[in-house]
Amino acid sequence: MYFNRKVTNKFLIAISTALIAVNLLIPVAKAQANKVTVSNLGNHFSNEVQCLAENIYYESASESFEGKLAVAQVTLNRVNSGKFPKTVCGVVKQKDEVNGRIVCQFSWFCSSAYSMIRNSYQWEESVLVAKKALTSEVSHVILHREKAMYYHANYVKPNWNLPRITQIGNHIFYKERSKI
């Protein structure tokens, strides 16, 4: 049997990449996954989905499913940290005053540009990711385990000095510095 080496190598690379991607998205056991669940959100579930979907959309609309899930995971890590508000909407809408000016945790929330959904496919995928993340159906294993709390676009140079975890798409993810 004859195999074209170039085609075979491309096929193997594609399969390897797919397996790695699937491994990153393997659901974490519900006991270990995000503490935010339908049962403890009650009537607020649809509001929490809306807030998380908006954050995913405005922070990562053009990213892959994994990139959107990564943004969702950081948001949920903050909810579960005890250092941020205890709800998704609280985390997403959090504002602080710095040197007399209002600063949002997620810059889109302080911008009027966020009022319009421009791409219905990206919005629908953002809602799907939000629902799956909130019900612990999926979790970004690496960012969940490493407790990623911050990220920025790869073209931004913040003055943070935090331990870098990884880059996913156009975002670089960080965790808080361990206390010694």
Regions found by a protein language model. Give the residues of each.
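C-terminal segment of classical bacterial N-terminal signal peptides
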Residues: A21-V28
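Bacterial extracytoplasmic/cell-wall-associated proteins, especially those involved in peptidoglycan
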Residues: Y2, K30-I180
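Bacterial N-terminal signal peptides that target proteins for export
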Residues: N4-I15
